[in-house]
Amino acid sequence: MRSGILIRSFLAVSLLAATCLTAHAEAPVSDNVKQAETASQFLTTPQKVVSDGAVTIRGQHIPYQAVTGTLIVHARGWDDSDIGPSDPKAEKKNPDAVASIFYVAYFKKGAHAENRPITFVYNGGPGSSSVWMHMGAFGPHRIVTADDSHTAAAPYKLIDNNDSPLDATDLVFIDAPGTGFGRLVGKDKEKAFYGTDPDAAAFTDFIAQFLTRFGRYNSPKYLFGESYGTTRSAIVANQLASEKGIDLNGVMLLSQILDYDNSIDNVKSNPSVDQPYVLALPSFAATAWYHHKLPAQPKDLKTFLSEVEHFALTDYTSALQDGTAISDEKLEQTAQKLHQYTGLPVEYLKKADLRVSGGEFAKTLLGDDGMDTGRLDSRFSGPAIDPLAQTPDYDPQFAAMQSAYVSAFNDYARNTLHYGTNPAFNDGYEEYKVSAHSIGKWAFVHKQPGAGRPAKGAPNVLPDLASAMKQNPSLKIMLNQGYYDLGTPFFEGIYEMQHLPIPRKLASNIEIHQYESGHMVYAHAPALTELHDNVVNFINKTHG
């Protein structure tokens, strides 16, 4: 879902074991100032805790080593030649911003680095931890949640994940700066990391540092980002190639958004742009089909969606382009057709000028029953907080499973990974931050490759992914989308892939998969099984 993802600390090789053991000896400090200094020192020093485990995936027993820790990443523009200030007090007064980025890595035991792929996994947000991908999709253990309804309160059940891709690749779950057990410290720390470009730079530096510290430069390398994580992946893939000299084997995208002008969320603020309505229509249709709100219910979803996609690109696009010049007859015909495809009332559609945002659709489809549909997964629904509001006040899908994920990971991290209880930090308690709550502070400013200056407004990272593909023509891309995703509609992702500024022959490097699920494709167990198979096949055919 939000997309973001990973976990904490790691010290130089000769100090790793010492860090894990001596931190407890340094911890409980009676003086508040000393305690704060100890915690600050702890946060700005790489940490590392190692544990062992095993999981059976598709009948294959896989013993693994789990490494949980943090790496320290400096704000963009930092130069390591500046290390060693002559006045420690001056540094203490006004230290540069740094991010302690939390991660959890799983390494298959006995595998040789050059033959063993490694995949860096994260969610989006922006400002989300990787708890969603970690506990719901790819980790060796996953949380069990209800399929399309609210998961009952604790106790929750954690099971071995038969669909983890650990059978094909080592996994590194990365939590975005300011999330997980990671923290930001220093001057202007939020400004230094809460933005499209500084966030991508932090991930780029983290990955390069991780490859060095763990000796994985010669391993086949992959990115897997969800939601805003796909935005990040496009930039990071390009920066790894152009700034670090690191070619990737593949980039896997889940619930993609690369051009925010295509978003159906805030489309009303850009009234001259109709494309988001066109690209969201198939997801509206899939949602109405799932809830049996269509005037005539088609039997086959995929056949139905092909018909809707054709209408969206032809008659619907034509009607929207007419604007206020549309004839009464064409307005009526288009509204009637939209009614057949969405289940929304004809008069409502006409009153909306044939233009319905994602939030308005989620509010209206089940509105007569006093229910809102989910945004991230429209299979879900929940009682409307305000039945008279124009858009929902909450996302029923997110509310349905947040507690399960958060509870499961906190228990798993502390009791299985043995992380988050170091006495050096706040008397032994560390909060796992699922979100940095940074969206309101986020600088959506992005400098595209070759641009003279950053562009303000909604980011468009299609040029970044295209640049990565041009620099490395063997780079393969895999797009995964859920039919019931109103946050990043699946047809939008297809459109973006078809409009990358790349030579046509490079388009063959892209493969696309859809699933009968939502934004968090893996929340639907059969879809998770499909996702595993597609990921493993993609990795196996793109290295060696």
Model-derived regions: residue spans:
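Alpha/beta-hydrolase fold catalytic core
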Residues: 324-481, 486-487
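A catalytic-pocket lid/entrance helix-loop region that shapes and gates access to the active site
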Residues: 140-144, 241-340
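N-terminal cap/lid subdomain of alpha/beta-hydrolase-fold enzymes
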Residues: 26-37, 78-192, 498
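Catalytic histidine neighborhood in serine/cysteine hydrolases
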Residues: 502-519
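Alpha/beta-hydrolase active-site loop
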Residues: 166, 176, 193-211
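Catalytic histidine-centered segment of alpha/beta-hydrolase-like enzymes
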Residues: 518-527
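Short alpha-helix in the alpha/beta-hydrolase fold that links the catalytic acid
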Residues: 475, 489-499
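Alpha/beta-hydrolase fold nucleophile elbow
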Residues: 216-227
